[in-house]
């Protein structure tokens, strides 16, 4: 199995970069523990890992006594048994390109992207605003896809809104398909930064190209089947695992949400 994750901390709330790092560490820790060397159920892993990351962000906010919670978007993909599955929450995207054409991409959790009429009172508010993310005081909404069978040369790209907010889907698909992934990624990032200029947002990109087993003999990498629970086979900087994935059921998540809401209520009462 292979895990690819991208999280983009949200502005307008405290410590978005911390929320993103917590999400990356939590999902990476869970993957290491459960992929031995493959996951038993990829979709179940993705949904439970996303909720676990959400819970850990809420726990962090509670322990710090924060009145507003750190928040982040998330997109994660697992490649296993010749197929890809993915999950996302917010507006970090996954693109899949096959034969030079855009096969599919995720849909942002914004009113504009989903083409939903905004609720009453939202007419003057930017419809690009997200209605869900990890770390908010409400349980996150997410979409999952897969498994999608992979073919020779398929390319998958995960990115923050700093890329797609500047470059069109067509531009992204074209550049990703016309050169090697190792060249396409820095070129895409540079193009987005150059086009956005001083108004550029954070541009983060992760990409891969699928090679069928009969055309690719892997000589690198580490299998999770042969490492202990306190060692990471990951490029993600990881913190301690102890206690990281305890109490990650729905009841624990609801308790954390209730604690955050109660803190907000008490703060509002004091100000009144």
What annotation goes with each model-predicted range?
Residues 1-272:
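PP2C/PPM-type serine/threonine phosphatase catalytic domain
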């Amino acid at each position: 199995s292979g895990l690819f994750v991208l999280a983009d901390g949200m502005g307008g709330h405290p410590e978005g970069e911390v929320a993103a790092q917590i999400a990356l560490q939590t999902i990476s820790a869970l993957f290491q523990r459960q992929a031995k060397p493959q996951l038993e159920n990829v979709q179940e892993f993705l949904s439970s890992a996303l909720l676990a990351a959400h819970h850990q962000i809420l726990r962090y906010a509670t322990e710090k006594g924060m009145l507003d919670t750190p928040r982040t978007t998330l997109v994660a993909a697992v490649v296993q048994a010749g197929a890809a599955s993915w999950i996302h929450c917010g507006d970090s995207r996954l693109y899949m390109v096959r034969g030079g054409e855009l096969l599919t991409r995720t849909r942002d959790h914004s009113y504009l992207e989903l083409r939903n009429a905004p609720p009453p009172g939202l007419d003057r508010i930017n419809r690009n605003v997200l209605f869900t993310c990890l770390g908010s005081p409400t349980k996150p909404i997410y979409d999952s896809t897969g498994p999608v069978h992979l073919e020779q040369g398929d390319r998958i790209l995960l990115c923050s809104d700093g890329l797609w907010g500047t470059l069109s889907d067509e531009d992204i698909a074209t550049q990703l398909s016309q050169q090697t992934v190792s060249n396409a990624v820095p070129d895409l990032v540079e193009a987005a930064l150059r086009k956005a200029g001083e108004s550029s947002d954070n541009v983060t990109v992760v990409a891969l190209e699928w090679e069928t087993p009969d055309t690719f003999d892997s000589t690198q990498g580490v299998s999770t089947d042969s490492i202990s629970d306190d060692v990471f086979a990951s490029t993600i900087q990881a913190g301690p695992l102890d206690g990281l994935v305890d109490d990650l059921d729905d009841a624990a998540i609801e308790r954390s949400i209730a604690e955050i809401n109660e803190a907000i209520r008490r703060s509002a009462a004091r100000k009144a």
